[in-house]
Amino acid sequence: MRLNIAPAPWPGAPVVVLSAGLGGGGGYWLAQRAALEEQYQLVSYDHNGTGENAGPLPAGYSLATMAGELFSALQAAGIARFALVGHALGALIGLQLALDRPEAVSALALVNGWLSLSPHTRRCFQVRERLLHAGGAQAWVEAQPLFLYPAEWMAARLPRLEAEDALAISHFQGKENLLKRLQALKQADFSRRASAIACPTLIISAADDLLVPASCSRVLQTAIPGSQLVEMPWGGHACNVTDADTFNTILRDGLSAMLPVARETR
């Protein structure tokens, strides 16, 4: 699996891995890069089955497989220890890694994640799957912003959304890959194991998230010992895109508290 590894801002700078949601694209974190790259060595990647790592996924594809793929790629690149910032599915990958490879994960920042899929989120995905089966990639892509962004934000950016739709359709990961990745997401359940997560953990949510209710992050914070929760009042599921300034401040402050070496080394 190909990783995009930025230069370290100085020797020994902490490594921060950025993991996207179901879309899988490393470009999802574009609005965060400038806010983080002066303090951390950033690693982004397209999830297997998407983008630069396109290709058919095996039967029985699971969250543990996703986490194992990322860990193996990081090891091959000589990265033994890292913090992970994950959005939705990316947050689940972070949880899996923190449990499977606790020696490697220095900290987690979990954005609009969950312990187990809520009935509301399951309903949303059922609707989206029906759209995929009935209308293919175009229907899936055109519906996606409704679950990601607040209405007023979308209404003010129609040309941008149309351009993003066209790009997403042209680079669509494929129906079979999407369904396998979605199935892995739906089956993930950390409700019995989250208490074993020992690394510092920041949880960020948005109060108006249509896809993943903010209450899921509150439950997650209760389950992970010592974790901290910051709830943004606005921004939707993709709050790191719609209100990047607020999100970046929260993330920078959280990473600085969890990874103090980033301050002391300078």
Curated annotation (Swiss-Prot):
Does the keyword field hold ATP-binding? no
**Which InterPro entries does UniProt cross-reference here?**
AB_hydrolase (IPR050471), AB_hydrolase_1 (IPR000073), AB_hydrolase_fold (IPR029058), Pyrimidine_utilisation_RutD (IPR019913)
Q: Which UniProt keywords apply?
A: Hydrolase
User: Which EC class is the enzyme in?
Assistant: hydrolase
Q: What is its EC number?
A: 3.5.1.-
Catalysed reactions listed for this entry: carbamate + 2 H(+) = NH4(+) + CO2
What family does the Swiss-Prot or TrEMBL record give for this protein?
Belongs to the AB hydrolase superfamily. Hydrolase RutD family.
**Role noted for this protein:** Involved in pyrimidine catabolism. May facilitate the hydrolysis of carbamate, a reaction that can also occur spontaneously.
This one is known as Putative carbamate hydrolase RutD
Organism equals Klebsiella pneumoniae subsp. pneumoniae (strain ATCC 700721 / MGH 78578)
Task: Give the gene that encodes this protein.
Answer: rutD
